[in-house]
């Protein structure tokens, strides 16, 4: 355990920094999506239509496309070969919606080509989900019960596992985005025209 300085354990500072970075990244993604959600695609296709076209063009015939509830809850599930698009993405003709749909198609292409980092990410998802779910409750309970260091340490370890998952995920996400940009530039879906 690290020593206390001025009554503060440096580990807590690292956790706070991690939370701040996570919050800032989430805010950036949301603001960028909102900005480009106001720009319509020149092709006037929805996110769902774009995804179906991309999958067909990439000759991926075993992946379904469905609409799900939520906002920016879009995901690709390699286990059931399902590309799920949130309501905001599925029905919108904005370049943001088409970009998100293409990004998720990038994950389907990764799966189709057996991209190793995607396989690694899929293998550690269960552990990371547990870590992100229990980390803050354990830290909070540890603090509430007279600074129970064992619970706090387990919470920090769980948070660390979730952070490691995010680090492993970055190359997968960047690769999916690169694939999406390549696909979109070939399909000419990104010629924007401002909405009225």
PLM ranges: what are they?
Residues 87-98:
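Short pre-active-site segment immediately N-terminal to the catalytic Zn-binding motif
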Residues 68-82:
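Catalytic zinc-binding patch centered on the HExxH motif and its immediate surroundings
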Residues 127-187:
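Metalloprotease/metallohydrolase-associated module, dominated by Zn2+-dependent proteases
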Residues 51, 103, 176:
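Residue-level signature of catalytic and energy-coupling elements of molecular machines
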Residues 189-196:
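Conserved small/polar residues in nucleotide/adenosyl-binding loops
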Residues 39-56, 181-189:
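Membrane-cytosol interface motif
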Residues 99-111:
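Active-site recognition of the HExxH zinc-binding catalytic motif
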Residues 1-8:
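Short, strongly hydrophobic alpha-helical membrane anchors
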């Amino acid at each position: 355990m690290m020593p206390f300085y001025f009554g503060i354990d440096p580990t807590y500072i690292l956790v706070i920094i991690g939370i701040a970075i996570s919050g800032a990244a989430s805010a950036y993604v949301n603001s960028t999506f909102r900005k480009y959600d106001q720009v319509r695609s020149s092709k006037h296709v929805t996110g769902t239509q774009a995804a179906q076209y991309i999958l067909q063009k990439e000759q991926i015939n075993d992946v379904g496309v469905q609409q799900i509830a939520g906002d920016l809850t879009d995901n690709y599930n390699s286990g059931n070969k399902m590309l799920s698009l949130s309501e905001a993405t599925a029905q919108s003709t904005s370049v943001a919606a088409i970009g998100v749909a293409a990004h998720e198609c990038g994950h389907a292409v990764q799966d189709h080509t057996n991209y190793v980092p995607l396989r690694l990410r899929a293998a550690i998802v269960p552990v990371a989900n547990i870590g992100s779910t229990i980390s803050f409750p354990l830290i909070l309970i540890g603090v509430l019960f007279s600074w129970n260091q064992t619970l706090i340490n387990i919470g920090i370890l769980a948070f660390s596992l979730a952070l490691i998952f995010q680090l492993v995920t970055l190359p997968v996400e960047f690769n999916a985005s690169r694939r999406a940009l390549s696909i979109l530039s070939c399909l000419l879906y990104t010629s924007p025209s401002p909405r009225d």
